[in-house]
């Protein structure tokens, strides 16, 4: 039996029984130093060949590991004289060897000391990353496999390519307001962009900047705060990533506080220099993928954290380095409370889809992150807000986060792209499934995204389509993060070309080559409709949108007609008839006409137009002074008197233009999002 158990020369019969000595007791329990290697331990994992106990056999009655020297981990910086347990080397821990095998002892590329987890001054990281050395950015080696993963190949169907209408972006009107607005850039050139970033932009097959990028790059590179509104699919992500990464490549990492180094030379906390907040797990994952693409071969290490995923793997990712952090507000607050993230080095704060984050109730977390933790104040950081809509209530909130900012409005903000052909069909609820099958048979090619209002309907409709031999899948808030990521991946690569989704996928997701969006259930807010159909017609490509409309959706009929007119789309006669029937009886949230509406200045810089919210259609958000009638007007603040054409309630009472104003129905102003009782 003993012979059978003699593994790798580990003889179980020889020597005295060993006892475990805790690390803090080793070397303190007496006994002579060992004099030679034991005969029976050679070849085991704990004792390299010929050097089992470093300097000799364990004496009878000795202390086992008690006399071993201080541990020095393996690595090029470890002494080579006697392998890992040899006391001939220095007795203290060699920080350069741990976690950075490529670095020599004390070399400039070491990740030890304060430079470990937060972007130290001389960092070389695995996976072909670059490093910052002697005040210069040194790019890492090329990695063909990683390049294919990040950038794809020419005409790769899983990567978004610019479409036939991309050049038309030059015709989109741009309004930039603020003091000393810098001139736009027309090409990706140096200056202002770093050469390394330009190479990565070329790898991504981007030829010319979009309108939002033309203006945002010089604004951010000039050190200004920015509030940018641009229609969805217009390159907002590149609008903030390009200048942030370019300046990081030029200026290098920030020093980590001297007391930040923990045991074994690691910092337990991450000290990112850039923080990007977004509302959904899918959107932060998408921004993270883009940041990996443009930080390729650089010293910048992007990280992503979001709820619903394993926090342990996210912590391990941050320990390997975290310079640019993409996060959802909830998970970020959790990690701050755990003491794993410090915001004191933040140079750039980005709020993407800011209006949706506030709509989803993230305002307390955002205010805590920005104002209640150790983030530098508004004067000591750059803050950028990006979204497809920026109603006045969001602009008023932005005053707390931004300083002397430039307001950038690109195109008809909050509107839809003319690249999208919009069709509205009158379909009763009972007929929706059969009409959907007709559409799928007619427009079968390409990826089709179907939006429904409820999680149950998403699963039900997906199962129905599968039973009709259409390969479909679904995503909604009740599916686990792994299920959602798997469904999105199958949709992206075309294995399931039909995706049924709730609003969780409506905002910000950039799914390449979606050719058709179907609004099976129309939303009650026209802004949600804008973002849903914005999943197609991206980057200059064309797309089709079909909406199923019936009298249950009459709350958005006027906003829908206005939207179709703006985009030069055909307006069905039944829409105009229903709009005339309901004139003056506005329902729903009011959409554009309520607190978030066009009358609320959703795409205007409120600094230029005062706080006035009483003008326009049904008033607007913000504080526009007391209304002339003495009552509450407007959908979102102290607006003006009700519009004269809209059967407003008597002066001095709650109202906002129309019996459905204010929140949903006359006599029930708090019923936000509901249908009019009329």
Curated annotation (Swiss-Prot):
Region Disordered: start and end of each range? Answer: 1-137, 585-678
Specify residue ranges for compositional bias: Gly residues: 104-130, 585-602, 609-640, 653-678
Q: What is its main location?
A: cytoplasm
Biased composition of type Low complexity is found at 1-15, 73-87
Q: Which keywords describe this protein according to UniProt? A: ATP-binding, Cytoplasm, Helicase, Hydrolase, Initiation factor, Nucleotide-binding, Protein biosynthesis, RNA-binding
List each copy of the Helicase C-terminal domain by range: 419-579
Task: Give each disulfide bond as a residue pair.
Answer: none
**InterPro entries noted in UniProt:** DEAD/DEAH_box_helicase_dom (IPR011545), Helicase_ATP-bd (IPR014001), Helicase_C-like (IPR001650), P-loop_NTPase (IPR027417), RNA-helicase_DEAD-box_CS (IPR000629), RNA_helicase_DEAD_Q_motif (IPR014014)
The record's annotation in PROSITE patterns points to: DEAD_ATP_HELICASE (PS00039), HELICASE_ATP_BIND_1 (PS51192), HELICASE_CTER (PS51194), Q_MOTIF (PS51195)
Q: Where is this motif: DEAD box?
A: 352-355
Q: Which GO terms describe its biological process?
A: cytoplasmic translational initiation; negative regulation of cytoplasmic translational initiation in response to stress; positive regulation of formation of translation preinitiation complex; regulatory ncRNA-mediated gene silencing; spliceosomal complex disassembly
Q: Which reaction does it catalyse?
A: ATP + H2O = ADP + phosphate + H(+)
EC number in record? 3.6.4.13
Show the stretches that span the lipid bilayer. none
Q: Motif span (Q motif)?
A: 186-214
Q: Name one GO cellular component term.
A: spliceosomal complex
**Pfam families, alphabetically?**
DEAD, Helicase_C
Where does this protein reside within or beyond the cell?
Answer: Cytoplasm
- Which enzyme type, at the first EC level? hydrolase
Give the Helicase ATP-binding domain ranges: 217-408
Belongs to which family? Belongs to the DEAD box helicase family. DDX3/DED1 subfamily.
Q: Give the domain note.
A: The Q motif is unique to and characteristic of the DEAD box family of RNA helicases and controls ATP binding and hydrolysis.
Q: What does this protein do?
A: ATP-binding RNA helicase involved in translation initiation. Remodels RNA in response to ADP and ATP concentrations by facilitating disruption, but also formation of RNA duplexes.
**Name assigned to this protein:** ATP-dependent RNA helicase ded1
């Amino acid at each position: 039996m003993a012979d059978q158990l003699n593994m790798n020369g580990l003889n179980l019969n020889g020597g005295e029984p060993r006892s475990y000595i805790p690390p803090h007791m080793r070397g303190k329990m007496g006994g002579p130093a060992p004099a030679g290697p034991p005969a029976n331990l050679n070849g085991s994992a704990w004792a390299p060949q010929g050097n089992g106990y470093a300097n000799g056999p364990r004496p009878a009655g000795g202390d086992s590991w008690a006399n071993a020297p201080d541990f020095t981990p393996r690595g090029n910086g470890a002494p080579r004289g006697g392998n890992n347990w040899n006391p001939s080397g220095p007795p203290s821990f060699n920080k350069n060897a741990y976690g950075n095998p490529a670095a020599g002892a004390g070399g400039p590329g070491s990740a030890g000391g304060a430079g470990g987890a937060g972007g130290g001054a001389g960092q070389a990281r695995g996976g072909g990353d670059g490093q910052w050395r002697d005040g210069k950015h040194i790019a890492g080696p090329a990695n063909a496999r990683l390049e294919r993963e990040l950038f794809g190949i020419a005409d790769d169907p899983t990567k978004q390519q610019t479409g036939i209408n991309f050049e038309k972006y030059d015709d989109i009107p741009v309004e930039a307001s603020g003091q000393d607005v810098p001139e736009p850039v027309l090409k990706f050139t140096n200056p202002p962009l770093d050469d390394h970033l330009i190479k990565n932009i070329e790898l991504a097959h981007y030829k010319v900047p979009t309108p939002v990028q033309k203006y945002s790059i010089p604004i951010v590179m000039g050190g200004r705060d920015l509030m940018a509104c641009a229609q969805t699919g217009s390159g907002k992500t590149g609008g903030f990533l390009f200048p942030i990464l370019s300046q990081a490549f030029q200026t290098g990492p920030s020093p980590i506080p001297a007391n930040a180094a923990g045991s074994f030379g690691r910092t337990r906390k991450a000290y990112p220099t850039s923080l990007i907040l977004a509302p959904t797990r899918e959107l932060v994952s998408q921004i993270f993928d883009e940041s990996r693409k443009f930080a390729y071969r650089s010293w910048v290490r992007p990280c992503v954290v979001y709820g619903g995923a394993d926090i342990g793997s996210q912590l391990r990712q941050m320990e390997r380095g975290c310079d640019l952090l993409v996060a959802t507000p909830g998970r970020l607050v959790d990690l701050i409370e755990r003491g794993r993230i410090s915001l004191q080095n933040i140079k750039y704060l980005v709020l993407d889809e800011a209006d949706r984050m506030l709509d989803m109730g993230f305002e307390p977390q955002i205010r805590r992150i920005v104002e209640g933790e150790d983030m530098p104040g508004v004067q000591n950081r750059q803050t950028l807000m990006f979204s497809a809509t920026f109603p006045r209530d969001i602009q008023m909130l932005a005053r707390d986060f931004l300083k002397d900012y430039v307001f950038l409005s690109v195109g008809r903000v909050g509107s839809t792209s003319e690249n999208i052909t919009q069709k509205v069909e009158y379909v009763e609820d009972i007929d929706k499934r059969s009409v959907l099958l007709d559409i799928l048979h007619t427009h079968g090619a390409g990826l089709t995204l179907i939006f429904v209002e409820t999680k149950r309907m998403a699963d039900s409709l997906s199962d129905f389509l599968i039973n009709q031999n259409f390969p479909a899948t679904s995503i909604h808030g009740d599916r686990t993060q792994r299920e959602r990521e798997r469904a999105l991946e199958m949709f992206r690569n075309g294995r399931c070309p039909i995706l049924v989704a709730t609003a969780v996928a409506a905002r910000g997701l950039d799914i390449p080559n979606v050719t058709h969006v179907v609004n099976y259930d129309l939303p009650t807010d026209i802004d949600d409709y804008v973002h849903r159909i914005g999943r197609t017609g991206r980057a200059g490509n064309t797309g089709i949108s079909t909406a199923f409309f019936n009298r249950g959706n009459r709350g958005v009929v006027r906003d829908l007609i206005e939207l179709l007119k703006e985009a030069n789309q055909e307006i069905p006669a039944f829409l105009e008839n229903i709009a005339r029937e309901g004139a003056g009886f506005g329902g729903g949230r009011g959409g554009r006409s309520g607190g978030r509406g066009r009358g609320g200045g959703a795409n205007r810089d409120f600094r230029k137009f005062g706080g006035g919210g009483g003008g326009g259609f049904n008033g607007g958000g913000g504080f526009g002074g007391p209304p002339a009638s003495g009552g509450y007007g407007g959908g979102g603040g102290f607006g003006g008197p009700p519009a004269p054409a809209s059967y407003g309630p008597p002066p001095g009472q709650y109202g906002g233009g129309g019996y459905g104003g204010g929140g949903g129905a006359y006599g029930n102003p708090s019923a936000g999002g509901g249908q009019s009782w009329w």
